[in-house]
Amino acid sequence: MAAAAQAPAAAKVVVATSPRAGGGGGGGGDRKVVPVVVAAAAGDEAQSEMHVLAVDDSSVDRAVIAKILRSSKYRVTTVESATRALELLCLGLVPNVNMIITDYWMPGMTGYELLKRVKESSQLKEIPVVIMSSENVPNRISRCLEEGAEDFLLKPVRPSDVSRLCSRIR
């Protein structure tokens, strides 16, 4: 029996946020509800098994990368920060992630810091991480690749970049 195409599902997740600098160790972070968008591409079920977590603080860049990934028949979850991505991954709220594509420079935790945390985690270290940036800084690119990034893409990301990555990761 063929599965029907699914519309993007919106879930709401309650997460704890840590206090800013000077907050001390009192354990009191605020809690807030954060929407998480998961979109499955219609069509080929075998390809839609590929699940990509796209992380970028820019809503425009998130929409662009999600559109490119969906046009290649991949399921996409988008989040606005590396901190949120790590929380959702560690809590198992975005299951079966095959790849993480993250912006390098974001407020709070950077994409580089997310890369390091993923690679240090016994639970997450096998997930390929791709870094994106609009800045072509050779030592930054080298550092990310040395820390275990699968690739470093310059923005704007093109469909050919995504096709190349996904063919290597399958």
From Swiss-Prot:
Induction: By cytokinin in roots, shoots and leaves. Induced by infection with the rice blast fungus Magnaporthe oryzae. GO terms for biological process: cytokinin-activated signaling pathway; phosphorelay signal transduction system. Residues 51-170 form the Response regulatory domain. Two-component system major event consists of a His-to-Asp phosphorelay between a sensor histidine kinase (HK) and a response regulator (RR). In plants, the His-to-Asp phosphorelay involves an additional intermediate named Histidine-containing phosphotransfer protein (HPt). This multistep phosphorelay consists of a His-Asp-His-Asp sequential transfer of a phosphate group between first a His and an Asp of the HK protein, followed by the transfer to a conserved His of the HPt protein and finally the transfer to an Asp in the receiver domain of the RR protein. Expressed in roots, leaf blades, leaf sheaths, shoot apex, flowers and panicles. Disruption phenotype: Dwarf, narrow leaf, low tillering and sterility phenotypes. Keywords: Cytokinin signaling pathway, Phosphoprotein, Transcription, Transcription regulation, Two-component regulatory system. Gene3D superfamilies: 3.40.50.2300. Pfam families: Response_reg. SUPFAM superfamilies: CheY-like. The modification 4-aspartylphosphate is found at D103. Functions as a response regulator involved in His-to-Asp phosphorelay signal transduction system. Phosphorylation of the Asp residue in the receiver domain activates the ability of the protein to promote the transcription of target genes. Type-A response regulators seem to act as negative regulators of the cytokinin signaling. Belongs to the ARR family. Type-A subfamily. This is Two-component response regulator ORR6. It comes from Oryza sativa subsp. japonica.
